[in-house]
């Protein structure tokens, strides 16, 4: 599958391109400000994973499948080897691609996720999103309010409803999901999990970035990380939650630029 991509690049980019992968229910556009800051002297691509953003809808949310989509897209766009950054679910996709196609990945940046199974906390939210009566909802804010029983944080509810857009069909004009929500909901067991070829590891430069206020990377995960990526550096960004790039964009960009410079990736 060829994925939708947002590309930013100077006239004469140098060094390997930087590729950005979003998390569950995110989209390439979420990296907008960060992507602009990182695209000085370097080609930077942000991809919509399958069933997200403007990419095609298709069943199958296994990480091997998602990684293959990214591989095919990077090959089509002549964007490998690359420095591959993934946030949350996108981080697991990035790790799997680095294991399956290590020649594609010059360096790996994983944001607030570890290579392990996570609890199924999102399943009730996905079901509530599927139950929304979009024929009677006229705005994203109204849809977000309707999800308050399953998600208390208004910022998270706004994030969950960013995949809604105005559509027009025989029943008239109303809101509809731009994303493949049913495919995502069915794929949650795969998204929550993690599988990799036995004994596989990525031996290139790697940075794992955690938010200090996020529970997603725990102390006991450090061994899992270094087993998978023996060269992994681990950094924690103060005052950042799970959405590290949104909470602390300046620190996020600085950490990436420091890693790239130290890894010999600089233009």
Predicted regions: what they are:
Residues 25-33:
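Serine-hydrolase catalytic-loop signature spanning alpha/beta hydrolases and amidase-signature enzymes
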């Amino acid at each position: 599958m060829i994925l939708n991509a947002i590309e930013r690049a100077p006239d004469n980019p140098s060094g390997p391109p930087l590729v950005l992968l979003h998390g569950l229910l995110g989209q390439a556009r979420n990296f907008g400000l960060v992507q602009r800051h990182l695209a000085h002297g370097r080609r930077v691509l942000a991809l919509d994973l399958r069933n997200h953003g403007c990419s095609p809808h298709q069943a199958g949310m296994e990480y091997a499948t998602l990684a293959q989509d990214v591989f095919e897209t990077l090959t089509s766009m002549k964007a490998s080897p690359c420095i591959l950054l993934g946030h949350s679910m996108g981080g697991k996709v990035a790790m799997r691609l680095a294991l399956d196609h290590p020649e594609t990945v010059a360096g790996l940046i994983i944001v607030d996720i570890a290579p392990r199974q996570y609890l199924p906390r999102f399943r009730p939210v996905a079901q509530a999103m599927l139950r929304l009566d979009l024929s009677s909802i006229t705005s994203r804010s109204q849809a977000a309010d309707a999800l308050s029983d399953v998600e208390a944080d208004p910022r998270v509810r706004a994030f969950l409803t960013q995949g809604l857009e105005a559509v027009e069909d025989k029943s008239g004009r109303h809101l509809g999901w731009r994303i493949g929500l049913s495919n995502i909901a069915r794929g949650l067991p795969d998204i929550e999990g993690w599988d990799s070829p036995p004994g596989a590891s990525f031996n290139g430069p790697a940075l794992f970035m955690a938010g200090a206020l996020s529970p997603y990377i725990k102390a006991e995960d450090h061994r899992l990380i270094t087993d998978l990526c023996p060269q992994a550096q681990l950094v924690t960004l103060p005052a950042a939650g799970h959405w590290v790039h949104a909470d602390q964009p300046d620190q996020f960009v600085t950490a990436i630029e420091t890693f790239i410079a130290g890894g010999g990736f600089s233009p």
